Curated annotation (Swiss-Prot):
Gene source species: Bacillus mycoides (strain KBAB4)
GO molecular function, one term: protein-glutamine gamma-glutamyltransferase activity
Role played: Probably plays a role in the assembly of the spore coat proteins by catalyzing epsilon-(gamma-glutamyl)lysine cross-links.
Protein's UniProt name: Protein-glutamine gamma-glutamyltransferase
E.C. number: 2.3.2.13
Alphabetized UniProt keyword annotations: Acyltransferase, Sporulation, Transferase
Family: Belongs to the bacillus TGase family.
Record carries keyword DNA repair: no
GO biological process: sporulation resulting in formation of a cellular spore
Keyword Acyltransferase: yes
Catalysed reactions listed for this entry: L-glutaminyl-[protein] + L-lysyl-[protein] = [protein]-L-lysyl-N(6)-5-L-glutamyl-[protein] + NH4(+)
């Protein structure tokens, strides 16, 4: 269900020739048909969310095609022209290097980088926002950037839920409860949902849910009897918060609205929104 202000609406893409129109329409249809409530103050916020999700998907595919390597933190490596590898295996932005340039280098020279899956997901989020922000804004928000698992910049606002419906552009988690301790890095897999039943996970590539589970199951202890599974954890960029940094001239997606109800009372507790 999608709510704009106090109006429950069924939105649709009005310009079928705009970039990624089919993908955006699919996202809108999924959100409108879900039981979860997606609340936006304005149509522009919904437009930003759509464009953000599309950029998360394209950034995930770009990272997959970049040659970016899967490595544990003990074996991680980065381009020393832009980053310094920390003692824990993270990547610390070098002084006087613009975060925007350093993030773009990961996608241009992926073979010069290697790390595990959580860091890769955060890199995708940064790249998606960079596609929507002016570089000076991105560099101001994410100065002194550190890439290390979930130790992301405080200005990157994320929402993690343990319930809800998966929408393309969401980050999900596959858990492998009986992982072989010899390959503990496969205790789980963070993955971006690309839509059409496919996910991107750093280390497993672009696969269906069943294929990712199969890959994780191959790395269990001998005689394991508990399968890996897709958890109910969903992580998203807080598009309402992050949309405030988009420039005024940000291209807007052409969205039409079929009104369903315009007197909804919207109540939000934490990250859960309810309609009365």
């Amino acid at each position: 269900m999608i709510v704009i202000g106090r109006s429950i609406v069924h939105p649709y893409i009005t310009n079928e020739y705009e970039p990624f129109a089919a993908e955006k329409q699919q996202i809108l249809s999924i959100m409108a048909g879900n039981q979860e409530v997606y609340s936006f103050r304005t149509a522009d916020e919904l437009s930003f969310d759509l464009n953000l999700r599309v950029n998360i998907i394209t950034s995930a595919l770009e990272l997959f095609q970049s040659g970016f390597q899967f490595r544990t933190f003990q074996q991680s490596f980065c381009n020393p022209q832009f980053w310094e590898r920390t003692s824990l295996g993270g990547f610390q932005l070098l002084p006087n290097i613009a975060p925007s340039i350093a993030i773009q280098d990961i996608f241009k020279n992926g073979k010069l980088y290697g790390t595990e899956c959580a860091t890769a997901m955060i890199i995708i989020f940064y790249k998606a926002l960079l596609s929507l922000y002016e570089e000076k804004t991105f560099n101001r928000l994410f100065a002194n950037l550190l890439l290390y698992t979930w130790d992301y910049d405080r200005d990157l606002k994320l929402i993690t839920k343990t319930s809800g419906d998966i929408v393309p552009g969401d980050l999900v988690y596959f858990k492998n409860p009986q992982v072989n301790p010899a390959t503990i890095e496969w205790q789980g897999e963070n993955a971006i949902y690309l839509g059409n039943f496919f996910f991107y996970g750093h280390g497993v590539g672009v696969k269906t849910k069943e294929e990712i589970i199969y890959s994780l199951n191959e790395r269990r202890i001998p005689y394991a009897f508990i399968s890996a599974y897709l958890t109910d954890f969903i992580t998203r960029i807080d598009s309402r918060m992050m949309s405030q940094y988009a420039p005024p001239n940000t291209p807007q997606t052409s969205i039409g609205f079929i009104p369903i109800r315009d007197d909804a009372i919207v109540a939000t507790v934490g990250h859960t929104t309810t309609i009365y």
